[in-house]
Amino acid sequence: ESKAKFVHIKFHDNEILNFGNIKIKAMHTPGHTPDSYCFVMEDRIFTGDTLLINATGRTDFQNGSASAQYDSLFNKLLKLPGFMRIYPGHDYNQKQYSTIDDEKKNNPRLQVKSRQEYVEMMGNLNLSFPKNMHFAVPANL
């Protein structure tokens, strides 16, 4: 499915990846990019740029989609057990991790009532273009 040329291992939504005795479930969570994935391991999830601590990944470049991210967040991640720890790819806000319940309660981007409200909110963020994106974007596509 991925158009990335450097992918060494291709996997699919809900596929179990085995690393010795460690099992990690791949969860396709498009939105930040079409190929965004989160990885579930026991009581934790590595959320990359999909769900951050008190924020969500931006969707305004790299073929992102706020509508797809809404589905990834509200129909997948937020349905996980509340105690599950989340470890984002960056923007930790000086915390080592958060939990699904903490994000439901405290994340301002998760307080919306509908897909339309989320899409409008994400479209109105007016974020500045990140530094070094001319290097990072090609590496992520």
Enumerate the language-model features and the residues they cover.
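Accessory terminal helices/loops
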Residues: 71-141
